[in-house]
Amino acid sequence: MELRYLRYFVAVARERHFTRAAKALGISQPPLSQQIKRLEEEVGTPLFRRLTRGVELTEAGEAFYEDACKILALSDAALEKARGIARGLNGNLSIGITSSDAFHPKIFALIRQFQVQNMAVQVHQVEANMSSLTAMLAEGELD
């Protein structure tokens, strides 16, 4: 089974319509329908119920959708991790945060954004008072 089939399946499941999914994927509708048909043959059961105005997932399609989304997310994460390592963005990052700033929305958002963009980097947060953080920085315990 190719990842491409999973991407096509997820697009149709989200759009609930072959033509809209094809447009979102940048392909024409007939090849998309053919790929979904091949996927259903490979799985051995229909994944969609064809309706007059779109499609809906079958029970098997619902279960397959959940796993397909997980597989695609893992595939994307693996790709980003490898790219990060190739750019030298891997390892650990230790940052210090004062207790008063630990839950500040902007700081939390920045850390989360960094983690998403640099999946190969493990971020460790140390919460302490300013004098302790300064000492830890001087000792090389924080980046």
Curated annotation (Swiss-Prot):
Residues 1-58 form the HTH lysR-type domain. Residues 18-37 bind DNA. InterPro entries: Tscrpt_reg_HTH_LysR, WH-like_DNA-bd_sf, WH_DNA-bd_sf. GO terms for cellular component: protein-DNA complex. It comes from the Bacteria. Keywords: DNA-binding, Transcription, Transcription regulation. Pfam families: HTH_1 (PF00126). GO terms for molecular function: DNA binding; DNA-binding transcription factor activity. Regulator of the budABC operon for 2,3-butanediol synthesis. Belongs to the LysR transcriptional regulatory family. This is HTH-type transcriptional regulator BudR. The lineage of its organism: Bacteria, Pseudomonadati, Pseudomonadota, Gammaproteobacteria, Enterobacterales. The gene is budR.
